[in-house]
Amino acid sequence: MPELVPIRYGRMLRSPFTFLRGSAGLMACDLATTPTTGLRVQACGDCHLLNFGMFATPERNLVFDMNDFDETLPAPWEWDVKRLAASVAVAARDNKLSDEEGRDAAVECVRAYREHLRECSKMSPLEVWYERLDMETLIEKAPDAKTKKMRADMAAKAHERIGEYLFPKMTVAVGGRRRLVDQPPVLFHVAEKGAEKRFRDGVEDYRLSLPDDRRVLFDRYRLEDFAVKVVGIGSVGTRCLVALFFSPEGHPLLLQFKEACPSVLAPYAGKSVYANQGQRVVVGQRLMQTSSDILLGWTAGQRGYHFFGRQLRDMKFSIPLEGATAAGLKRYAAICGTGLARAHAKSGDAAKLSGYLGKTDAFDQAIGKFALAYADQTVRDHAALVAAVKAGRIKALVEEDL
């Protein structure tokens, strides 16, 4: 949706870190020129610090894991590690930390990745698939009382981020029916003729992608309303819709249908084996994630667009990085590195990866240097975007100015 692209650029303008978040394709192009071992895993494709967070498992447990898989594709494992480490270094600068502190946090991230891969290499495949990092454990293992309270508070906030809590804020009663509230330009209804029929057809196609038992659940709900929703940074400009459903008893269900385009890794790692890009995302997410949304599925629009569907939020909560201390960033980076190792071990050969990485910190230090170098590159790229907007070559819409 070209009319939304200026919002994307506006969000990327905020800082080098938001620029990095919105430029997965640019970094994929850069990473494709770097050496690799030839070992491949199911890669995230957009692995950065804010693509980790909390969410609910089907058993309603709160876990910490990767939570965004729009770009997932089988690819070299190094690409995820380098993007994650670079995001650590850029986030450090965003928080006014020194380059030494940023490098140390990036090194700690990679060290945690390397050491957890070694642990995974000693497990059976089933044990790797069963492994998860739940918030209760993270709270219990907090290094001090302050960190423990902070993690407990964030977990409490995550428990509130479910459809039942979100529903009153996003809807209003109109003529005896609940409707999504327009909040242009970030949430608005589609006035185009035939849009509702196309959407209903797409929902039926999505239904067919669900396992039989999940269809029984989904069939308890009926569609009431839908609207376009602008989400994230890199996703702005792609089609994303939020849909409101109700059960016969009046219980709400909010689903998000997000357009799935070919992965930014595809030009360099090879195209997906799945014709529907939504299916690519769903399969990759199920392969990498600890546990996935019970209503995760895919669909195709009549105009050739591909989508994947899931519950809106469902206890999804990203850890705020603003104001992070050097010690706090280091701890968080290590947790993310551990999560990435587990995700890679599910699809890759942990023993081979661990054997390559070895027991010394040589790889950790090398990626730490890379992270700082790429942080410099990100600053230059962000400055180029700022200059292009000021010169009028690129149109950006800063939402704070609306």
Predicted feature descriptions by range:
Residues V172-Y221:
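Ordered core of a single globular domain
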